[in-house]
Amino acid sequence: MKTSFSRDIKITLVDYDSGNLRSVTQALGFAQIKPIVSGNPADILSADAVILPGVGSGNSAMQALRRKQLIEPIREFITSGRPFMGICLGLQLLMDFTSEGETECLGVVSGTAEHLPSGVKVPHMGWNTVKIAQPHFIF
């Protein structure tokens, strides 16, 4: 399979004390990519691509992003149009809000990340149907 992807790309893996950095770094290593693991805004803004991992609660993750002054650099990077990936909680943080503590998130995608209903197996893995309520530039 051919790809136009360059392994020389500068990928910043955002370190904000709420991410599964080791597993993401290891996964990238299988593709022979060594990310820059950093909580420095300059490393985010100068990256070719950014990955925002996440484990835990949206409330504590947003507090950590705020404390490390990473909210605006992440928003600026996303609006630049360069590749950005949120993994697990990192993806949920792109929403306007999370129902965990009714926390304001990054506001890149309109909506609220909701708790799964009781009785649903967690972690919830598998295929689901995604319904787009309105057009958005990332879809």
Give the label of every model feature segment:
Residues 51-53:
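Structural motif
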Residues 47:
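An anion/phosphate-binding loop that grips the pyrophosphate of nucleotide cofactors and donors
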Residues 1-7, 44, 79, 112-139:
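Amide-donor transfer/coupling interface in amidating biosynthetic enzymes
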